[in-house]
UniProtKB/Swiss-Prot annotation:
Needed cofactors: Mn(2+)
Keyword tags: Carbohydrate metabolism, Hydrolase, Manganese
Name of the gene: fbp
Effect of residue 469 to D: In fbp-74; abolishes FBPase activity
Induction notes from the record: Constitutively expressed. Expressed at a fairly constant level in cells undergoing glycolysis or gluconeogenesis.
Entry protein name: Fructose-1,6-bisphosphatase class 3
Activity regulation, per record: Activated by phosphoenolpyruvate (PEP) and by high concentrations of monovalent cations, NH(4)(+) being most effective. Is inhibited by two types of compounds which apparently act on the enzyme at different sites. The first group consists of nucleoside monophosphates (most effective are AMP and dAMP), phosphorylated coenzymes, and denatured DNA and RNA, whose inhibition is competed by PEP. The second group, whose inhibition is not competed by PEP, consists of highly phosphorylated nucleotides (pppGpp and pppApp are most effective), nucleoside di- and triphosphates, and PPi.
Disulfide pairings: none
Keyword Transferase: no
Secretion signal span: none
GO biological process, one term: gluconeogenesis
UniProt xrefs under Pfam families: FBPase_2 (PF06874)
Organism, scientific name: Bacillus subtilis (strain 168)
Reactions catalysed, as given in the entry: beta-D-fructose 1,6-bisphosphate + H2O = beta-D-fructose 6-phosphate + phosphate
Length: 641
């Protein structure tokens, strides 16, 4: 088998010189400094804030500009240059508007092109020429390389270089070149992006985030609980679909469903208009300018889909006793005559109820109309071209957890008991815990995605369990109290008891144990965790367990910023070590363009490498070493006999 493989490879490397050249090239790359990793999490559909963090590389762009130009140009010019790199098209329009004379603008173009070339050169210093070429604007790659590789002894060619820039300006190409170089800088300052979960949720533009990620040069995703809800819906889970629409109605984001993904909500609206009225508990958290009649429509839709959701949950709970969720059969615990519910031996009065479609004898039975509506919605979801593209990318680039360069990336938690031992869940009569449990969860999710025509098999039900189950690594609470929050006034019923992981992650021994469970070195590895906002306002530290645990909820969701005191955190990991970056609230692109100010506050060193980390010590390095070994085998097999 191996000889056949090597014979095939020899078609590409058909002489010894080609093999040797590639081995030399790969071994040289292994000794370059590792590229910068950028970690972001909990984007929650907030595209504008997310793409700003992406454009500035969590401060890497301005850091590079300061390295080169600090003390050479004024701080105001540094801010201007940074804004030009972040938003080249918009900034160019503003700058050109300030020039009256063409000669002055042309001088500005010359100076700016020189600065941008310097910046690209500095940002690409640890990359091969081949990798740099891929990052350059394609139409100007040759010209840019000529300007980049100008040497100190280039006196004979000085006029040649000047003429290149003069001609670029004269032929009206300066804007295109500057814009292309700006995007090259953005690409060069970050080698690889990790999105540690929750692209989707309450924010208005998750679709634009997905498009941005699809076009990004190097990215992976660790699924969040909201991401899995969307994957589950696309995979055939009607209850996941009902949850998505309910959340979109609650946060006045039904546009995502209808306008962005082309899913027809008219049948649901007709059902809602027939059975439901206005209800304060279901009014959306809407824009103040939204007309009252639209708010009432959304309120009715919100009730209709919530009741469908509650009804759809019951059959799953009944057919999956291993989910251990019998206490969530809430529709059966209601006294419909008295409008009361008994929970844990205590009776509560229900408020703002909307039980028009419930048969007290069989409370979880869908009306024929409700069943028809959810079937139509599922058909629309599974036939949305755009959603299909986004979900396929999510599955291709995503996983429940990732081991990368010695670190463990995970959105939610590793379910543990009070003593830090991995919790066990029985699935198909077999116990699973820790890494094995997450692996089986992911296997079922991929199986559900591969068979969207199945709507009530174990794999599809497991997608919903990942959203709401006690031992789900994405939920990590005893129960989700959605029903109680709508209908019961007493706040004690709203509490969701968290898995002990969330306080034990402060403990170094627990974190070391988790790293070891995933086959990572506890002395050098870290757990990089999203999902929970860091309440800095109350003194909470995102660096926990003596540096073994780093919590980086990006805080992009405006709703959480009042509880955290800041917008959130991102993480950078380059060849020198790890830096945690705190962000202020992002107001608008216009503010950045006009003032040049950034949303970053402070960077904190998490870990400093004693020696610069090289490519050979990374995941990419492992792959390159395998390639080298194969090429050496080919050389021996084919050319050294």
């Amino acid at each position: 088998m191996e000889s056949k493989y090597l014979d095939l490879l020899a078609q590409k490397y058909d002489c010894e010189e080609k093999v040797v050249t590639e081995i030399i090239n790969l071994k040289a790359i292994l000794n370059l400094p590792k590229g910068t990793e950028h970690f972001v999490s909990d984007l929650h559909g907030e595209y504008q804030a997310f793409q700003h963090v992406l454009r500035n590389g969590s401060g890497r762009v301005k850091e590079k500009i300061r390295d080169i130009f600090s003390g050479v140009i004024y701080d105001r010019e540094i801010d201007e240059l940074a804004a030009l790199v972040y938003y080249p098209e918009d900034k160019l329009k503003l700058i050109k508007h300030d020039f009256d004379a063409k000669e002055a603008l042309n001088e500005w173009y010359k100076e700016t092109i020189h600065r941008m070339i310097k910046l690209v050169s500095y940002c690409s210093s640890k990359y091969t020429r081949s990798k740099l070429r891929k990052a350059l604007p394609a139409q100007f790659a040759y010209i840019t390389e000529e300007l980049l590789y100008k040497t100190e002894q280039a006196g004979n060619k000085e006029q040649y270089y000047s003429e290149i820039i003069d001609q670029i300006i004269e032929l009206g190409q300066a804007d295109k070149l500057i814009t292309g170089l700006a995007y090259s800088v953005q690409r060069l300052v970050v080698d690889h992006l990790h999105v540690v979960g929750d692209i989707y949720d309450r924010g208005p533009q998750p679709d634009r985030i997905m498009e941005e990620l699809i076009n990004y040069h190097s990215v992976d995703i660790q699924w969040g609980n909201h991401d899995v809800l969307w994957i589950g819906a696309y995979s055939g889970s009607k209850v996941c679909l009902a949850n998505i629409i309910r959340i979109c109605a609650r946060y006045d984001n039904l546009d995502i469903i209808e306008d962005v993904y082309g899913i027809n909500l008219r049948p649901l609206l007709n059902l809602a208009e027939k059975y439901y009225d206005d209800n304060p508990a279901f009014r959306p958290k809407a824009d103040e300018n939204r007309p009252e009649d639209e708010i009432k429509q959304i309120t009715k839709i919100h009730q209709a889909i919530a009741m469908i959701q509650f009804k759809l949950e019951s059959p799953i709970i009944k057919r999956r006793p291993n989910f251990n969720m019998e206490e969530r059969l809430l529709l059966e615990k209601i006294d419909y005559d008295k409008n009361e519910i008994t929970l844990n031996g205590k009776t509560y009065q229900l408020e703002n109820t909307c039980f028009a479609t419930i048969n007290p004898e069989q409370p979880d039975q869908l009306l024929e109309e409700e069943a028809e509506v959810i079937d139509k919605l599922l058909f629309s979801v599974q036939h949305s071209e755009k959603l299909g593209r986004h979900m396929n990318f999510m599955m291709k680039k995503g996983s429940l957890y990732l081991k990368y360069n010695g670190n463990l990336l995970i959105h939610g938690c590793i379910p543990v008991d009070e003593n830090g031992n991995m919790e066990t869940m029985m699935i198909e009569d077999k116990p699973y815990a820790g890494r094995e449990l997450l692996d089986v969860f992911e296997r079922f999710l991929r199986e559900a995605f591969a068979h969207p025509e199945e709507t009530d098999d174990l794999a599809t039900d497991m997608a919903w369990y990942l959203w709401t189950g006690e031992y789900s690594s994405l939920f990590g609470k005893r129960a989700m109290t959605t029903f109680e929050r709508y209908f019961i006034k007493e706040k004690e019923t709203h509490k969701e008891k968290k898995n002990p992981y969330y306080y034990l992650r402060e403990d170094e021994a627990t974190c070391r144990n988790i790293l070891a469970e995933f086959g990572l070195n506890p002395d050098h590895g870290h757990i990089i965790n999203g999902h929970t906002p860091v309440k800095e306002i109350e003194g909470e530290d995102p660096i926990k367990a003596n540096g073994k645990m780093i919590v980086i909820d990006g805080g992009f969701s405006k709703a959480y910023q009042s509880t955290t005191g800041i917008a959130g955190y991102t993480l950078l990991y380059n060849s020198y070590g790890m830096q945690l970056v705190a962000h202020k609230h992002f107001n608008s692109k216009a503010e950045v363009l006009s003032t040049g100010t950034d949303v970053l506050t402070v960077k904190r060193l998490v870990d400093k490498e004693l020696e610069r980390k090289k490519v050979k010590e990374t995941n990419v390095g492992e792959e390159l070493l395998q390639e080298v070994a194969i090429l050496e085998s080919l050389r021996e097999y084919r050319y050294m006999k």
